[in-house]
Every structure is written in C-alpha cells, then in structure tokens.
Amino acid sequence: STFWPVHEVGRNADTFDPEGARLLAANSLLVSDSLHLHSNGRDTEARLEIGWRFHPKGYKPKYKRAQRNLGNAVDIDIKAMEKDQELHAYYVLPEHTKITTFEPHLHAPGARMCLESIWGINVQALTCAGYDHNWVRGYEYAPGYEPLLPKGTILHITGYMDNTPGNENVPDPRNWQGSGNRSVANMFIDLGHGVAMTDEQFQEAMDERREMFKLTKNDVVTGCPLCMVMPEQPTVERAQDRLTAAE
C-alpha cells in the first residue's frame, strides 16, 4: 500500500525521479478518505479522474521511495484576526535522501511555507514558496539541483498563516481554527517526494554533483552539505602522486 496519490484543489501532477518511479501492483484499488474537495452545504456526488504515465515495459527502479513524514495535522491552533502566525515541524532523515519535489500543503489560512535542512551547525534554506489554497502546487527541483542530504539530517518546515480579512480564502477570520481535513480547518505538511540511497549510491550522486559543478573543498553548494568533503585517494594512489610531485 502507499499514501500516494493525493488530490488537492488545483493541484498539478506528481513527478518522480526517473530512476525512482512508484510501483503499482496489478489489480490495485484506489481508496482515499481525504480528497480535499470544497464543501457546498449538501450531499453531492463527485467524480475524480486520476491518470498515470508509465515507464516502458521492463523498467525497474534503481531507488526506493524515501520516508518523509514531515508535518503536523493534529494539534494546530490558529488565532483569530492575526497574520504571520508560524507553525514548525521537524523530521530526522533515516536514510541518505535525494529530495526531488517540495509540496507545501496548508489549508485556507496558509500563506507560505519554507523548507530547510540542518546538518550539524550548518543550516540551509532549501525552498520557500507562497501558498494559495485555491491553487495547490508541487515544485520539482531541476536535475542536478536536488538536495542530497545524508542520513541524520534534520528537515525543518515553517508554515506562515494569515487568519485576517486580507486573506480571501478564510470565510470568517474572527474564529480561531484547529486541525482537520476540511478547507476551513488546517493541515501543515510537506507532501514532496524523494528517493532513499545506499552509501554507494549516495557517494555516486555526490561525485556526479562535484563533477557537474567542478567543486573544490572551498565551494559551498546549498542542499549538499557533504559535497565539499572530498573522498581520499587510495593509499597507493596518494603515494604515486607524491612520488610524481617529488620527481
């Protein structure tokens, strides 16, 4: 089973790493109890069509889906008549991860969400995006610019909420708002995708990034805290280099 796909108002299509596509078993059933449709005050039947683009027959994914349980949809408390309210959530990556998309998921009072990574003393802003609950968007990182984050990295999202008359999505800003599936209640989640990597795959991806940008140990690349940690040469190769230099 998988939590994907998710449907939200005005949502664009999901995209995945070309080498980390989702596997859908034959004869699978699609079941969801949270389609994020706007209520209209009466019982209504709705039809939702979901389509896929498949890889060629024989395709096998190189990577598996990365875990990313980043958010809070349980104990949210949004004050009445106040903007720039902040929500925070954290998640420690259990595996080396390449993040391929960022998708802020808020509800009516949502105005903005930011994603940052924390690795030791290094804190880097990865993405910030505005939010409009009438037009929910996912953002795909360009090839070669996807964050490459080592196991143990702390992901941190910050949500900015606007529960004032200036936010036309809010029906009555005089009311406080809690958590829930309805558009007039609240969620605070990053629904983006990524792939998990083994030690070897992660090193390979960083080597490709170093080659792509011709990196040295003096450079800084946002979203790849270990890219500037250059792997040591084997002892024999180091000795040969020193011998050549001495000659």
Predicted regions and their residues:
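Beta-strand-centric surfaces of beta-sandwich/beta-rich domains
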Residues: S1-A246
